[in-house]
Amino acid sequence: MSKRDFYEILGVSKTADNKEVKRAYRKLAMKYHPDRNSDDPDAEDKFKEASMAYEVLSSEEKRSAYDRMGHAAFENGMGGGGGGGNFQDIFGDIFGNFGDIFGQSRGGGGGRSRRGSDLRYVIELTLEEAVRGCKKEISFTAPAPCDTCDGKGAKNASDIVTCQTCHGQGQVRMQQGFFAVQQACPHCGGTGKQIKNPCSDCHGNGVKDKSRTLEVSIPAGVDDGDRVRLSGEGEAGGAGVQNGDLYVEVRVKPHNVFTRQGADLYMDVPISITDAALGKEVEIPTLDGKVKIKVAEGTQSGKLLRVRGRGVTPVRTTMKGDLICRVVIETPVNLTREQKDLLRQFQDTLDGDSKHQQSPHKKSFFKKIGDLFD
């Protein structure tokens, strides 16, 4: 274990009070706890390092010794407390019921029982399903309690006995450098129990892979990336151990008309040059049916028109968003000779009319160019 400065490990100054030390340790413990970082091999070392730093800096006596002598104060074991303290005491002081946060029980005297792993399932929804809510049936394979032994892991209840290595505590004290730390018992896996005659079907694990089908209720207003938690529907934890949770993650398929940004929906409304110039009432689709919007005379391409209350009501709110319509003026193609002649005549009338500002963006553009070279 690296002998980094304890203040540096927790990220606090040497004048930090106990509240600052506790707050810094809590943040690191939440970040690096092994139960939250099963795929990060370095997390456990960082967690232990932070715990050691907190054990010293939270004790007035040990902190004073560390400030005077540094790590040398503990070369022969932790002073005063005899052997480095109990991490359960630290957790109880900092987090209260630590098991509620990390899914495992650390209660006094009992075995250390790990909960089943959480599972993740990605479900695809249409925009309409996400906005209105729906029920979906999902199927997956995951560890579930063994039918043969009812999840006990043993042929008979009498085959489950107290672990003789940890005496039912689920933890053993291990010496690591100049600290003594509590670790899960390697013989019983932290349960405090051992099985004399394991179930032949699950080999004592209490769980077996099974295919499952569940109906999931998707609440109205979910968005891409939102998760629906199904408590206790995750991986079975084994004999006498709490199940993990199932997280159903939403993926919303792209829509051919609408895009969503928070509570608002966006869409393009294509109109002709003549409709933009003369103005027109245009019928557009919404998720609640068709509505008509007024395109004002002289509307420019890119203009945003807001239709209030035609958006989405997100989860956990009652405020419905709007539908934002972006006007897209389409330039005509494949014109006939007659149409081209008419357009040229129309253009001539624009060029010859100096009294009216009929092309505001064009006039503004050329004025800016002129200002640039003046």
Curated annotation (Swiss-Prot):
Biological process per Gene Ontology, one example term: chaperone cofactor-dependent protein refolding
Pfam families named among the record's database cross-references: DnaJ (PF00226), DnaJ_C (PF01556), DnaJ_CXXCXGXG (PF00684)
Family matches, as Gene3D superfamilies: DnaJ domain, Heat shock protein DnaJ, cysteine-rich domain, Urease metallochaperone UreE, N-terminal domain
Domain J residues, every copy: 5-70
Keywords associated with the record: Chaperone, Cytoplasm, DNA replication, Metal-binding, Repeat, Stress response, Zinc, Zinc-finger
GO cellular component: cytoplasm
Cofactor names: Zn(2+)
GO molecular function: ATP binding; heat shock protein binding; unfolded protein binding; zinc ion binding
Subcellular location per the Swiss-Prot or TrEMBL entry: Cytoplasm
Cofactor: binding details: Binds 2 Zn(2+) ions per monomer.
InterPro entries, A to Z: DnaJ, DnaJ_C, DnaJ_domain, HSP40/DnaJ_pept-bd, HSP_DnaJ_Cys-rich_dom, HSP_DnaJ_Cys-rich_dom_sf, J_dom_sf
Residues that hold Zn(2+) 1 according to the record: C146, C149, C199, C202
Disulphide bonds in the chain: none
Keyword Repeat included in the entry's annotation: yes
Positions bound to Zn(2+) 2: C163, C166, C185, C188
SMART domains according to UniProt: DnaJ
Recorded domain comment: The J domain is necessary and sufficient to stimulate DnaK ATPase activity. Zinc center 1 plays an important role in the autonomous, DnaK-independent chaperone activity of DnaJ. Zinc center 2 is essential for interaction with DnaK and for DnaJ activity.
Subunit field text: Homodimer.
Family: Belongs to the DnaJ family.
NCBIfam families assigned: DnaJ_bact (TIGR02349), PRK10767.1 (NF008035)
Function comment: Participates actively in the response to hyperosmotic and heat shock by preventing the aggregation of stress-denatured proteins and by disaggregating proteins, also in an autonomous, DnaK-independent fashion. Unfolded proteins bind initially to DnaJ; upon interaction with the DnaJ-bound protein, DnaK hydrolyzes its bound ATP, resulting in the formation of a stable complex. GrpE releases ADP from DnaK; ATP binding to DnaK triggers the release of the substrate protein, thus completing the reaction cycle.
Protein name: Chaperone protein DnaJ
Organism: Psychrobacter arcticus (strain DSM 17307 / VKM B-2377 / 273-4)
